[in-house]
């Protein structure tokens, strides 16, 4: 997985955009509970700007983070308290933190879905295994692919988010195309901000495109077992409810 250009161009307003998403929040509590229970140290793979990881460090948990985007890590490092966290710029499938071992490794907000090939998925899981302390836990989440949506070849562009950036409204428009043969969806997001009323900020548009894979339940279990995870729990939401047909996610807790 190369550095996703979308994160290089959108890192500066990533936090503002995703703070406006009501569906986020329960995931941070889920990973915080695991982190506190582990006692640390904790590693987030695909840590981004620190939305989930930074609050763990403020609780006194020893933390480290890995991300492939220099721009996202720059945003992370600007935040108060980030100096206590060891941050590394590396890809999910090839990160190497030497002899460091962690009681909990996690990958939040569907970061695992950025791994487009089976080889990359297995490589990432192998790197996670190599960095787990004895008895350590790996946790991550992906969305549950609803058949009525993945059956669609194309979802036309539609506005799906409005947030405030530097005192002015910014709108996000998203278009999705799917390739069911490869289980990949191409997501194009267009961020639009009008010129400010005083004319000091011109109109702005940023367009980004990235790919996400999707997984079926037993496909995930197979990948985990192939890489040495023998105790795998799966849930359908961040409240640890069982997986049902209409569950929004697959949450994995593996040892």
Residue ranges and their predicted role:
Residues 50-95:
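Class I SAM-dependent methyltransferase SAM/SAH-binding core
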Residues 142-219:
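SAM-dependent methyltransferase
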Residues 135-142:
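Conserved beta-strand signature within the Rossmann-like core of class I S-adenosyl-L-methionine
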Residues 1-40:
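Conserved class I S-adenosyl-L-methionine
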Residues 122-134:
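A short glycine-rich, Lys/Arg-flanked "PGG" loop and its adjoining helix->strand segment in the class I
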Residues 211-255:
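C-terminal lobe and adjacent flexible extensions of AdoMet/dcAdoMet transferase-like proteins
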